[in-house]
Amino acid sequence: MTGYEAWLITFGTWMYSVNKEQLARAGFYAIGQEDKIQCFHCGGGLANWKPKEDPWEQHAKWYPGCKYLLEEKGHEYINNIHLTRSLEGALVQTTKKTPSLTKRISDTIFPNPMLQEAIRMGFDFKDIKKIMEEKIQTSGSNYKTLEVLVADLVSAQKDTTENESNQTSLQREISPEEPLRRLQEEKLCKICMDRHIAVVFIPCGHLVTCKQCAEAVDRCPMCNAVIDFKQRVFMS
């Protein structure tokens, strides 16, 4: 009997909203108390399931250090779950879009680390979201590199400045070289300013230190929030 089969048996006549086969595949078994379940590997427990909740996503959300989860889904999946959580608060919903289009765009944009990087470089969230939406609608896919995204954002800013001929105040002009220079600086650890950033702090979501410096801090150097978990990320 495989691990999956053994875990599945524990659910018996499971009558709750989440599919028991999906729960078993995600490494969970039922403990016989209402809808409470537990991971066979990390021991993490979950309960109070809501309809359409994904067991893998909940596993990654609450127990990102689980080795079984890491083996089955990989670093990128776990990183995307936590980056999505940290960015969802910045989403401005618009009633002009259909629900299906809004879902498609949010599913494509928010797991993308380039969004957070562009925000950290000083670009406005609404401008980034708008240009990513246009990219998806015209080409069917999102940006592949941060450099191309930055170049298009700078170009859009220049077009906006030229069209607003009646402005009464001068706008600071960003040269094409400046964002690229800042991009290189933004990739550096904000503590040692030597190695590349490689760790995202949970729950605040800030990505500001290399692996070595992250091991030496208990609070986020950006917002001073207590760090509950340190998740390794791999930037391209």
From Swiss-Prot:
Molecular-function GO term, any one: cysteine-type endopeptidase inhibitor activity involved in apoptotic process
Zinc finger regions, RING-type: 189-224
PROSITE patterns: BIR_REPEAT_2 (PS50143), ZF_RING_2 (PS50089)
Placement of BIR repeats on the sequence: 7-70
Main location: cytoplasm
Binding site for Zn(2+): C39, C42, H59, C66
GO CC annotation: cytoplasm; nucleus
The protein's name in its UniProt record: Baculoviral IAP repeat-containing protein 8
